[in-house]
Curated annotation (Swiss-Prot):
Annotated source species: Mycoplasma genitalium (strain ATCC 33530 / DSM 19775 / NCTC 10195 / G37)
Keyword Cell membrane on entry: yes
InterPro entries, per database record: AAA+_ATPase, P-loop_NTPase, Signal_recog_particl_SRP54_hlx, SR_rcpt_FtsY, SRP/SRP_N, SRP54_GTPase_dom, SRP54_N_sf
GO cellular component: cytoplasm; plasma membrane
Keywords per UniProt: Cell membrane, Cytoplasm, GTP-binding, Hydrolase, Membrane, Nucleotide-binding, Receptor
Descriptive protein name: Signal recognition particle receptor FtsY
NCBIfam families: ftsY
Disulfide bonds: none
Subunit relationships: Part of the signal recognition particle protein translocation system, which is composed of SRP and FtsY.
Amino acid sequence: MGFLSKLIAKLKPKKSVAKQLKEEVEKQSLFQTNNKTYYQGLKKSATTFAKTINELSKRYVNVDEQFKENLFEGLVLLDVGYHAANKICDAIIEQIKLNRITDFQLIKELIIDQIIVYYIQDKLFDTDLIVKPNFTNVYLFVGVNGVGKTTTLAKIADFFIKQNKRVLLVAGDTFRAGAIEQLNQWAKLLNCDIVLPNPKEQTPAVIFRGVKKGIDDKYDFVLCDTSGRLQNKLNLMNELQKIYQIIQKVSGSEPSETLLVLDGTVGQTGLSQAKVFNEFSKLTGIVLTKMDGSAKGGIILAIKDMFNLPVKLIGFGEKTSDLAIFDLEKYVLGLLNNLNLDNKEN
């Protein structure tokens, strides 16, 4: 599978500050994953896709409309999205015909190749978290209820605290008392400071106080939790827009990161969430959680296709160490792990 590494290496961006920081603490467990983690976390998705492709290999005679239809079906079942699935299928068939490929093992490798090429296209996203040096970096976490915003925020806080960075948590989920208590418990566990809402205080006011304190007291990071909100509730989306504008006004710049946390099991529903949240707050990236319970691993390609947004973090479970910076090569290898690429028999 060396061709994957070579293909990705050609398009890798220069090291960001976050990349350099990450390398300084490479002995820390958070955000470090090996191939096995991806294989286990994407097991359901890999099984779904492999079933289609391996069945296709048994019936394979030549490249025709039936072949394309079955390949398309396999990609759609992963929630790659219709547009992306069509483009990938067309590219695969074009390469098969151009190079007169008949060995299905080579076709399997070509499928992987074209998925990588499609995701990268003109460039490979830098999936590291944005970190501005000598600056109070404000991270805003948004999403619907129950996707894991608060837990994700705490895991990222843990990551930076282990680098001896000063981190301030802001409990902006004023709709749910449990969320405030949850984040407060995380603050105690991580031994970091937190801004809690006053009685009846609304989210925008809490965010204002938190960001101002973070800047005035020269914290390295201010991590802002927000209430879960459905994308079809206009009043709540308008409040999110107000929160975003408050951060801009207080800090003098946009948040370093505005991360939409998506439940990886919801598939195409996540795309409609991303569309609306991106309209009301300028998203910088996606965090996909609960991928260990999802058979829809192709959603990452659909997000890239529709919004040109990077998936920055991917979660495979509830433990602190189960959140990883998204690694394209490990992701693709995990997604296609059951394709039996080392087996020379169809």
